[in-house]
Amino acid sequence: MSNKYNNLLKEVAAKYASIILNDAKIKSLTSINSAEYLYDSFVEISKLPLEKKLPLKWKLITVKENICTKTNLTTAASNMLKDYNSPFDASIVESLKKAGGIILGKTNMDEFAMGVKSENNLFGRTVNPVVKDSNYDVGGSSGGAAAAIAADICYASVGSDTGGSIRLPAAYVGCVGFKPSFGRISRYGMLAFANSFDTVGIAANNVKGVTKVFNVLDHPDINDSTCLTKEARYFVKEQHKKLSRKPIKIGIPIDWNVSETHPNVLDKWNEFISLLKSNGYLVQEIQLPISLYANSVYSTMAYAEATSNLAKYNTIAFGNCLDEKFEEEIISSTARSFFLGDEVKKRLLLGAYSLARMNSSDLFSKARYVRRAIQLEFNKNFFLPSFSVDDPRGDIDFIVTPSFFNSSQPIETPSSYSHLSDTMLVPANMAGIPSVSIPFGTLNNGLPMGIQIMAQYLNDEDLLSFAGQFA
């Protein structure tokens, strides 16, 4: 073995040992590829021609447990899929590998991405690595992804964001979490929760790292019909060039200054607004009153979509099996009760209730109407057009809010409180617009403060460029 590869082997072994040690307490990883696999990947990449562009060369990347990989089980953190081995890599995993990235392993999550605490019956709970005694909530559902970044386990982590899933944990641990516009990144190979809300999410230590991964994943994919075509991307890019302008205007939604927000969070929000003004940005108050109903609409629509998406996990088409020999209907019902966790079962029941014939017109149909109203409300404030709505526009480039009402809470905090934790983040999923959570110092309790920045639909590049000035 040459000295070059001998030194590389030592580096991989040292890094591998460090990863195992760092993750022992926080439990951000559900599986990790072997040291031999990592070494072989490093060697394979090092043999490629120097002129070959590899933006993620030798970067260790983790992916969420609901993203398909051939080298690891893909369980969605559920006993229903605890032995599922995907025969293919998700499109995003293929893209990461082609860019020189090395898949380190999979990260923990709430079962089927339903929850805000990153806990499940299969792998247990991920804890917040920024708290020394490790008894604080890391957020969810992509808590393992953010925790892996905060613990310096990987360069970047790719998860999902259905209602704040990557941004809330990122805010809780003090890293950057990004949800792109709906349709920018392929979801082929990502297990669905709610199709009209699901996006791929990216976490990294800074906006530069997030941007690098986003540029690798941001491309058309014929395997995902909701992924924007090459022609659509070109059209949007050209239109945005024609409409670009200065000075940049920042909108502050006064409706979001609600009583539930902790006073210290409000202080940090105002501090960030002052920073924007001192940097020469124009700041003005805007109104987004309908967006305050986003959480209620999300609960109705997302749970209904989940009811449909998870119907296939009946132990007959997909899913773990019971030993008992019953009729098919009994097998399916019994297995779902046995293998699915309480939070998933609760959401599926609520989704089924909103889709029932006697309720759908009052619940699901009205929720769709309110969702559209939220999209229009955002659109009328932004300067750039959304290309899906032909309505009067405003003059705002970016909207700035806190990422949460309050910081990470002790693990024993009641779940009824935790379910409000992503209220600030859900509206971006509702409207399909890009949103990034960036760290902004710490609160009086020593925990990280997160600031959310949102932009018009498909204006992802400008959003990341703007956010990169602060993180």
Curated annotation (Swiss-Prot):
Which subcellular locations apply to this protein? Mitochondrion
Q: Where is the signal peptide?
A: none
Q: Which GO terms describe its molecular function?
A: ATP binding; glutaminyl-tRNA synthase (glutamine-hydrolyzing) activity
> What sections of the sequence does the record tag as coiled-coil?
none
InterPro entries xref list = Amidase, Amidase_CS, Amidase_dom, AS_sf, GatA
Q: Which residues cross the membrane?
A: none
Q: Name one Pfam family in it.
A: Amidase
* Subunit record text: Subunit of the heterotrimeric GatCAB amidotransferase (AdT) complex, composed of A, B and C subunits.
Name the chain's protein.
Glutamyl-tRNA(Gln) amidotransferase subunit A, mitochondrial
Q: Which organism is it from?
A: Schizosaccharomyces pombe (strain 972 / ATCC 24843)
